[in-house]
Amino acid sequence: MNLKTHAFNDRGRIPSRYTCDGENISPPLSWDGVPGEAKSLALICDDPDAPSKVWTHWVIFNIPPDSTGLEENVPDAGRLPDGSVQGYNDSGTLGYRGPCPPSGVHRYFFRLYALDTVLDLEPGASKEDVLEAMEGHVLGEAKLIGLYRRG
C-alpha cells in the first residue's frame, strides 16, 4: 500500500495551513494498493516527539476500502457521509488537530491500515481503542511522515 499527499513530500515540511499556525485543517491524502480482501481502512496521525507522550492528532476508521483518499478539511464530525467514523484526538476533540509543537522539529506519522473487518466502535473512540480492535486484523499498512517546526 502507498500513502501520499500533494501538500508535502514524505519527510517534508507540513505547510502551516494544516497546523495550529494556519487553518488547522486536515491535509488531502490519497492511497493505492489496498488489498482486495480489505473490509475497511483506518488512519491514525500522531507525534512521537511530543514531550510527555506520543500525541494523537487524528483517528479515523471504518473508511470504505474502495476509497482512494480523504479530501482536504475533513469535517470534525463523529460520523462522515461515507460511513467513516472519527475518534478523539489528544486535544479532546473529534477529528483532526494539526501540528502545534512547543519547540523544535517534530515528526508527524500518518499511518493507514487495511483491515479484514469493520471495527465495532463508536465515534469518539481513542487511538488505543482502535489499535486494540485492529489487533489480528491488519492486512497491510502504509506510512507518510511530515515534519513541522513553529516559527
Swiss-Prot record:
Q: Which domain of life is it from?
A: Archaea
Q: A Pfam family this protein belongs to?
A: PBP
Q: Which SUPFAM superfamilies match?
A: PEBP-like
User: InterPro entries this protein is in?
Assistant: PEBP, PEBP-like_sf, YbhB_YbcL/LppC-like
Write out the similarity annotation.
Belongs to the UPF0098 family.
Q: Which PANTHER family match?
A: PEBP (PHOSPHATIDYLETHANOLAMINE-BINDING PROTEIN) FAMILY PROTEIN, UNCHARACTERIZED PROTEIN YBCL-RELATED
Please report the name of this protein according to its UniProt entry.
UPF0098 protein MTH_273
Organism of derivation: Methanothermobacter thermautotrophicus (strain ATCC 29096 / DSM 1053 / JCM 10044 / NBRC 100330 / Delta H)
